[in-house]
Amino acid sequence: AVTLVMPRYRVVHAAGRGGRRLPLTMGGRAFEVGLVEVPHGPRERVVLVECDELYDREGLYGAGGQDHPDNAVRFGVLSRAALEYAVGLESPPSIVHAHDWQTGLVPVLLRTRYSADPVWRRIPSLFTIHNLAYQGVFPAETLSALDLGSELLSIDGLEFWNQVSFLKGGINFADTLTTVSPAYAREIRTPEYGEGLEGLLVHRQHVLTGILNGIDTDTWNPWTDPYLPAPFSAADLGGKRFAKRAVLTRYGLPDDATAMARPLIGMVSRLVGQKGLDLVWEGRGALAAMDAAFVVLGSGERRYEEMWRDLAAAHPTRIGVRVGFDEGLAHLIEGGADLFLMPSRFEPCGLNQM
């Protein structure tokens, strides 16, 4: 059986509230945390960590182009709550799998706070790095706010240029490390892609493995996709034009014969420099001059959000923008676009390319 633990963000819609109460104190501050179990399949369950003061807000990690200022505490509480939930199970887990900086403290806590327990001392941890550029770096005094000892402010702990890095903590303390592709596992051990952690990753390369990401070919199958207005396949593209027209309609763009004959270029992406948005910025005039329509779905750095909004305002019949994320619209764009705009600087794996 697999148990997934995640925050109950505002955008999470699931039945039930309250659940098991978990009084939790961190850095002298008390938090009222709820643990709500949600069935998710015959051998899977989801546990939602409820704490409205931390998770019931706009944006998962930030809003308005800025990180939430208390992200260290938000994800420190998540890490503690996940482990406290696991400790309360009848049977301990076979392995604890943490992802990215947001849960980088989980391996740290396993080898510090929970290391005195003879059962938990033997449970291995796996830490997966999805993107090394996002490191969860906070001021050094964050350690005390998380009830972590000052000895962790060291090269073998979380210290990173006189600050603390949750990602580095996960890399240092996990028993095994993975990335989302074999190529990325090699790349992050170089100065070009190591983001200042290449030395540590070379040191730990004996436990580092790249495992290629995948997509659910049932979910992303245009023949059966419920988000598409008509089915199609590589062998029968007849239904694709209905998806294209639906995209144009959703964005308020013309959908007459001329518009349908024009290439539709889609972009479903985080709007950040890594995705090559600086290249789009430099070439925005040439892009706007193309006899093509553009539809964009994503969020990220404010300057790139505003760039696309300005382009849409200047070319309202050919450029449409939605800032945010919409699962159904993402499927519609993937199904209806003729081309995709993907000028990424680098990709740890590249799910959209898949």
Regions found by a protein language model. Give the residues of each.
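Catalytic cores of nucleotide-sugar-dependent glycosyltransferases that transfer UDP/GDP/TDP-activated
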Residues: 1-354
